[in-house]
Design a protein with these regions (language model features):
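Structured beta-strand-rich core segments of catalytic domains in phosphoester-bond hydrolases
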Residues: 1-63
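Metal-dependent phosphoesterases centered on the DNase I-like endonuclease/exonuclease/phosphatase
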Residues: 2-5, 76-165, 169
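Short Gly/Pro-enriched turn/cap motifs at secondary-structure boundaries
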Residues: 9-12, 36-37, 161-164, 189-192
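Active-site beta-strand termini and strand-to-loop segments that position acidic
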Residues: 24, 48-51, 175-176, 201-205
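Surface-exposed cleft-lining segments at the edges of enzyme active sites
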Residues: 35-36, 61-77, 112-117
Length: 205
């Protein structure tokens, strides 16, 4: 892609997980993962440092069927929150990606039947609440607290996308001191090609 510098963080296992950042502005530094060996093998985090903020691109682990990875997910959530808070002590943070949780009932089409499904367990939702309570803002909900039918992921089954039976699990989350710089946050649900769609943040930094 002309004009963009690319950074990749791949999983040890081929074809599994991984993150990427494409940027028109050269970062001051780029780091991969976040210093804990347990989380070092799935390519889930890239941090790009810019003069006025950190960009943290993340693909949060899925808790899996029968919640087989829920315990790991809980440890991940605590560790990534600590990492974000460490960064936030230095300069503001923009945290984005597939965070694999629909935080509130408004963020999922069918909350009732999904209460113990991965991505909508009480445990996962509580971890998101704890993160936001630590000094971070969900940019989309900050601007549109009551907007319904706004989703970023749809199952390939049951005509979910056609029926807009989706989940909002992709986010831009920013340090609270950046909230007055949020110009817009959007979900481009019309963009096809994946079971996810792009989410967008316009931030005045």
């Amino acid at each position: 892609l002309p004009g963009y510098t690319r950074f990749w963080n791949s999983a040890d296992k081929a074809g599994y997980s991984g993150t990427a950042v494409f940027t028109r502005h050269q970062p001051l530094s780029v780091t991969y993962d976040f210093g804990i060996d347990e989380h070092r093998h799935e390519g889930r985090v890239i941090t790009a440092e810019y003069p006025d903020f950190y960009l943290v691109c993340c693909y949060t682990p899925n808790s899996k069927d029968q919640l087989a990875r829920l315990d790991y997910r809980m440890a991940w959530e605590d560790d990534i929150r600590d990492y974000l808070l460490d960064l936030d002590a230095k300069k503001p943070v923009v945290y984005c990606g597939d965070l694999n949780v629909a935080h509130q009932e408004i963020d999922i089409k069918n909350p009732g039947p999904n209460r113990r499904n991965p991505g909508f367990t009480d445990e996962e939702r509580e971890k998101m609440t704890k993160l936001l309570s630590s000094g971070f803002v969900d940019t989309f909900r900050y601007l549109y607290p009551d907007k319904t039918g706004a989703y970023s992921w749809w199952s390939y089954r049951f005509n979910a996308r056609k029926n807009n039976a989706g989940w909002r699990i992709d986010y831009f989350i920013v340090s609270e001191r950046l909230k007055d710089k949020i110009r817009n946050a959007d979900i481009w649900s019309e963009v096809l090609g994946s079971d996810h769609c792009p989410v967008v943040l316009d931030l005045d930094v």
